[in-house]
Design a protein with these regions (language model features):
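Active-site neighborhood of thiol-dependent amide/isopeptide-bond enzymes
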Residues: 87-160
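His-Asp-centered catalytic microenvironments across diverse enzyme cores
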Residues: 27-40, 61-84, 102, 147-160, ...
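A near-ubiquitous, low-amplitude feature marking generic local secondary-structure context
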Residues: 43-47, 81, 110-113, 117
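Linear, non-domain "peripheral" regions
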Residues: 2-78, 95-102
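Selective for proline/serine-rich intrinsically disordered segments
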Residues: 1-4, 11-14, 298, 303, ...
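Substrate/cofactor-recognition hotspot
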Residues: 295-325
Length: 325
């Protein structure tokens, strides 16, 4: 556990009391909520690194994209990164990430970095760094967990992106801070990474609803088609992402391999009803945040506990991790 991480509570006491106005639009209370740092995104003593960043989310996305090398897709070992550095994937807090990034290369975050000068991580890490940058500028921004269609044709791949409030257009945009400007999918499609449409990124709630309705095949949802681990595909992965997305909407941006009772339970009829209600509240890019926060606060099974079980994507044993004290 990082002792320097700021205190917070899983009951989310900082959630605003304001709600959605009569037109269904996000009010200033919730915009302010998402414009402030969470326990995970707080830069702490490294806050100075976020000074002087670009003032718009498009440029911020480019900065965040240049800080992470993906632990699988980026082939870090082939770039000469020592195997012991693979444990950087467990960097839970932005303060920890920024500290390590300055060790790898001193100077502003906007500078170009070689693969060896980037932090080994995944989409979640690009996202929380992007969140920290946006929130430092007062931009309302939050993480969303779901499935991308632009990595492996025909499959929905486990992924985390950001959702940014566009003040000019008065709407939320799904933005992927983990792919480069020149990224093209394997089937030759260029991705609208600054405004992902539903056919490119399916929110976990929508994935759950479509699979429950029979309009999508749950066997197409997974971490990686080449990964033959039962819990990383089909219903277990969809359920896991659904619970992770609820936590993210409550500004509790966990590692993607963190699990707790709400994400790994054996499903009963009661559980299915609960998850159906959860999917109903989180399946859109403009959910009723008052209901989302209330759902999280009222159901202990869905809340992230102080101690979680963190699985090891590198193949090691699971570990109990206390992230909240």
């Amino acid at each position: 556990m990082d002792p320097s991480a700021p205190e917070c509570s899983t009951s989310n006491p900082t959630a605003p009391k304001a709600g959605i106005d009569q037109d269904g639009e996000m009010d200033s209370g919730y915009l302010s909520y998402y414009a402030t740092q969470s326990r995970m995104t707080d830069p702490g003593r490294m806050a100075g690194l976020l000074d002087g960043l670009p003032k718009n989310f498009a440029a911020l996305r480019q900065v965040a994209c240049g800080l992470i090398i993906h632990y699988r897709g980026g082939n870090p070992l082939q770039h000469g990164i020592p195997a012991e550095r693979m444990r950087e994937i467990d960097s839970r807090y932005v303060e920890t990430m920024l500290t390590r990034l300055t060790e790898l290369k001193d100077g502003p975050l906007t500078g170009l970095r070689s693969p060896k000068e980037k932090l080994v991580g995944c989409c979640r890490d690009s996202t929380v760094l992007f969140l920290a940058m946006g929130r430092a500028l007062g931009i309302p921004i939050r993480a969303r967990v779901g499935f991308a269609t632009y990595f492996v044709p025909g499959y929905y791949i486990d992924h985390e992106v950001a959702e940014v409030w566009d003040a000019e257009e008065q709407r939320w945009r799904l933005v992927d801070p983990g792919i480069g400007d020149d990224f093209v999918s394997r089937d030759g499609v260029r991705v609208s990474y600054l405004d992902l449409p539903p056919e490119s990124f399916l929110l976990a709630g929508s994935a759950w609803q479509q699979c429950r309705a029979g309009t999508a095949d749950p066997e197409k949802f997974m971490v990686d088609p080449g990964l033959e681990v039962e819990d990383t595909r089909s219903w277990p992965q969809i359920r896991h992402n659904l619970v992770q997305d609820l936590a993210a909407l409550n500004k509790t941006e966990m590692l993607l391999w963190d699990t707790w009772s709400g994400s790994q339970q054996t499903l009963t009829d009661r559980d299915l009803d609960r998850l159906d209600r959860l999917a109903e509240q989180t399946s859109a890019t403009n959910p009723d945040i008052a209901k989302v926060i209330r759902l999280y606060q009222d159901d202990p099974e869905l809340q992230v506990p102080a101690t979680v079980v963190s699985e090891d994507p590198l193949g090691g044993p699971c570990r109990e991790v206390t992230w909240l004290s």
